[in-house]
């Protein structure tokens, strides 16, 4: 189910989050001895926008950083994307390539709230 969309500052790309798929896996943020090595993640799907006719072409389907990405945003220059993951009580910040629209490595993450009902549902850069 599509949940959130975010046009990039240059309007060359469109990113959508999808909830409830859990088709991707990522390394677990919890490094304790009893944690599993990988956890499920819903995708963030990025499309390139054709400037002439507005058509979309798939760029990538990347992990959102966990389950149920309720909201995400980009910083002003489009080099960072923050994802709010409600079911995992986590916010994850990725590098983003402004030329390709692709996400890079995780540069920061934080646990926010407790339980499925209290996880973050939106994240916004304050610049």
Which residues does each PLM region occupy?
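Feature marking well-ordered beta-strand scaffolds used for ligand recognition
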Residues: 1-127
């Amino acid at each position: 189910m599509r949940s959130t969309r975010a046009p990039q500052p240059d309007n060359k790309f469109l990113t959508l989050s999808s909830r409830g798929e859990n088709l991707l896996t990522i390394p677990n943020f919890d490094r304790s001895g009893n944690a599993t090595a990988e956890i499920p993640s819903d995708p963030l799907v990025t499309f390139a926008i054709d400037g002439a006719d507005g058509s979309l072409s798939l760029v990538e389907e990347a992990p959102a950083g966990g389950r149920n990405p309720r909201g995400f945003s980009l910083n002003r220059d489009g080099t960072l994307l923050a994802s709010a993951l409600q079911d995992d009580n986590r916010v994850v910040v990725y590098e983003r390539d402004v030329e390709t629209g692709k996400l890079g490595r995780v540069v920061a993450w934080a646990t926010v709230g407790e339980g499925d009902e209290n996880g973050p549902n939106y994240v916004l850069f304050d610049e």
